[in-house]
From Swiss-Prot:
One Pfam family matching this protein: 4HBT
GO biological process: fatty acid biosynthetic process; negative regulation of DNA-templated transcription; negative regulation of fatty acid biosynthetic process
GO molecular function: DNA binding; DNA-binding transcription factor activity
Coiled-coil portions: none
Designated name of the protein: Transcription factor FapR
Family that this chain belongs to: Belongs to the FapR family.
Length: 185
């Protein structure tokens, strides 16, 4: 059932407030209107496009991390609960893929996961001690990879972090990281 313009606009605002990472395409499917209509409604509501919403959320999250600088982070940090869990997203661009196949280079997915582990741990010095990783599915040009990291254990010198990365709802990468930390810096 299609909503009247005012009700649709309010519903769009509520959807974006509850999930700032929802795409115009997903909104258009949800409200059964064209993507152009969604864009006009967002403009009327002064709601920025997805990339800008992601950047705004990421900027707030970078204030919570101490072990890595924003410009060193791979992807955009979209959620962080220090020493507990964190999420990032990474858009796969032409610089990130093999040109012949359009498949993402493995070190790009590893770098996203690794920098997420470093950012997750709120200590002055955090280094990767060891990792065990698996590439599950191919990641392609223009995919958006969402990495989720969570601390599974902590000792006097190490955090043990599990990372799972997804494209939409498909698991594409997983890894276990043993992260050394030093409180002295």
């Amino acid at each position: 059932m299609k909503l009247k313009k005012d009700k649709r606009r309010e519903a769009i605002r509520q959807q974006i407030d509850s999930n700032p990472f929802i795409t115009d395409h997903e909104l258009s499917d949800l409200f059964q209107v064209s993507i152009q209509t969604i864009r006009l409604d967002r403009t009327y509501l002064n709601i920025p496009e997805l990339r800008k919403r992601i950047k705004l959320v990421a900027e707030k999250n970078y204030d919570q991390i101490s072990s890595i600088e924003e410009q060193e982070f791979i992807g955009d940090l979209i959620q962080v609960n220090p020493n507990v869990k964190a999420q990032s997203i990474l858009d796969i661009t032409s610089d990130s893929v093999f040109h012949k196949t359009g498949i993402a280079r493995g070190h790009v997915l590893f770098a996203q996961a690794n920098s997420l582990c470093v950012a997750l741990i709120k200590q002055p010095t955090v280094l990767t001690h060891e990792s065990s990783i698996q590439f599950i599915e191919k990641v392609k040009l223009n995919d958006t990879v969402r990495a989720e990291a969570r601390v599974v254990n902590q000792t006097a010198k190490h955090y043990y972090v599990e990372v799972k990365s997804y494209v939409k709802h498909t698991l594409v990468f997983k890894g276990n990281f043993k992260m050394f930390y030093d409180k002295r810096g």
